[in-house]
A protein has these predicted regions:
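Nucleotide/phosphate-binding sheet-loop regions of phosphoryl- and nucleotidyl-transfer enzymes
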Residues: 1-222
Length: 222
């Protein structure tokens, strides 16, 4: 359980982000979207859970499409959110989303995600939501605040998942350190070839060399 004051503290901090970004969490036409990530004191790349594009729902996705002028981007972001949240928070197996995506590409006669258009992503959003409801017996949560607290719970919980525990054991990271949860305004890496996602270090994490080190993927999220 969380400290009694935490919900109010999160709400106050979220209001501060809204003011900086001039966006409103959950507002259909001007929605603030969030990323929810771990913030452990030692880097554990890929070990902890992450949820991106949080705040998207059937209304805010239309607002994102209008604001960006790119319907394909908006619905691609929504299907990514459904897949990530469905897996990390709701416990729907990751491969079920991937299998559905591959089946859709086969029917369309394409091989790459980039060959799918806005209508394809719209259809996959509907398919993902239907699959989640079938698996869980309840619909995907449309309330952004319910989404947020589900993601916060999941990221805190991921400190104790199997891969994180194994990584800590291999790298002598104490379990009692725990993790923070970072809730940030969403920055999109999937808006085109001039966008990317990646990680950067001021020292090489493998050997401590005083040199910049990093990796990135173009037109992707992570």
């Amino acid at each position: 359980s969380y400290p009694q004051a935490l919900k109010e503290q999160v709400a106050d901090a979220l209001a501060g982000v809204e003011a900086i970004m001039d966006l409103k969490f959950g507002e259909a036409g001007n929605a603030l979207l969030l990323s929810v990530r771990s913030g452990a004191r030692a880097s554990m790349p890929g070990m902890m859970d992450t949820v991106l594009n949080l705040g998207l729902n059937d209304e805010t996705v239309e607002g994102l499409a209008a604001a960006s002028g790119d319907e394909r981007f908006a619905f691609d972001s929504y299907r990514r959110f459904l897949q990530m949240y469905g897996d990390v928070v709701l416990g729907v197996e990751h491969h079920m989303f991937e299998d559905m995506l591959e089946d859709h590409k086969d029917r369309r006669g394409v091989h790459l995600d980039t060959e799918l258009g806005a209508e394809d992503w719209r259809q996959l959003v509907d398919d993902y939501k239907a699959m989640i409801e079938k698996e869980l017996g309840q619909p995907f949560p449309q309330d952004p605040y319910e989404q947020l607290w589900g993601a916060i719970d999941a990221v805190f919980g991921s400190w104790m998942n199997r891969r994180a525990k194994t990584y800590r054991s291999l790298h002598n990271i104490p379990e009692e350190w725990g993790t923070a949860v970072n809730v940030q305004a969403m920055v999109f890496g999937n808006m085109g070839t001039d966008c990317a996602t990646g990680v950067a270090f001021t020292r090489d994490p493998a050997n401590g060399e005083n040199a910049y080190y990093g990796e990135y993927l173009i037109n992707a999220q992570g």
